[in-house]
Amino acid sequence: MLKTTGAFMMCLLLVSCSGTKLTGPGVKDGQLAPCPGSPNCVSTRAQDEKHRMDPIRYTGTKEQAHQRLVKVIASMPRTEIVTDQGDYVHVVFTSRLFRFRDDVEFVLDDAEKLIHFRSASRLGYSDLGVNRKRMEEIGKRFAKTTLP
């Protein structure tokens, strides 16, 4: 059992460290960068099912949605808000075990009352669904979060 676990962890490490680092995050021409071909990225702007997720819907003002989003992010472990410009928030999530860093970007679209996002691993090819699960969790927490 211990050998199997050790072998699995070694394979995970090798798969995660292979590949190239993603290009820098940010909004380009008003849009989040597209996901690469690898499965370690999800985005509300992706056209293919492998990478596509629905945006987070909100009611109220953009400022209230922003406050709720930041509150959710701050409640999650191993997070660092790198950039917070109101309409755009860039967060780095660090994994507990191997300290892998994932870039998550949010863009608030007040006209549509949507929060678009892109969540991508910096290294490797597969993330075993971590980015998708994280964004599903953020969406659930956002829906339950209220402001005082």
Regions found by a protein language model. Name each.
Residues 1-6:
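Bacterial N-terminal signal peptides that target proteins for export
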Residues 13-16:
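C-terminal motif of bacterial Sec signal peptides marking the signal peptidase cleavage site
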Residues 18-148:
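Ser/Thr-rich, low-complexity intrinsically disordered terminal regions
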